[in-house]
């Protein structure tokens, strides 16, 4: 579960290392975001000469959470960290060209096929 002020790892090669959630998108008063939800983030740490810089405000999709996701068969998939992939504000496509670490099949339902195709492992 991701809420405001949660620090997330950035799981792409856009140049950002860490991002902080500043708003959970999708309805007024919505408090938590899970895997596949779109959030608004502020970049907290970035590498030099990157596509994004510290202080940028962007949209991102949550790809991994410590809370995990429950499947219909009763299994739960949990991760060691909270991670997101930065999105372009205009067309909701990823800014980076590579995705680091595994992602879940639930992103396919949310119309993020580009992230699924770039990911090295889909659980």
Swiss-Prot record:
SMART domains: Ribosomal_L14
Gene (UniProt): rplN
CDD domains: Ribosomal_uL14 (cd00337)
Function recorded in the entry: Binds to 23S rRNA. Forms part of two intersubunit bridges in the 70S ribosome.
Gene Ontology annotations of biological process type: translation
Species of the source: Blochmanniella pennsylvanica (strain BPEN)
Protein name: Large ribosomal subunit protein uL14
Single GO cellular component term: cytosolic large ribosomal subunit
Pfam families in alphabetical order: Ribosomal_L14
Family per similarity comment: Belongs to the universal ribosomal protein uL14 family.
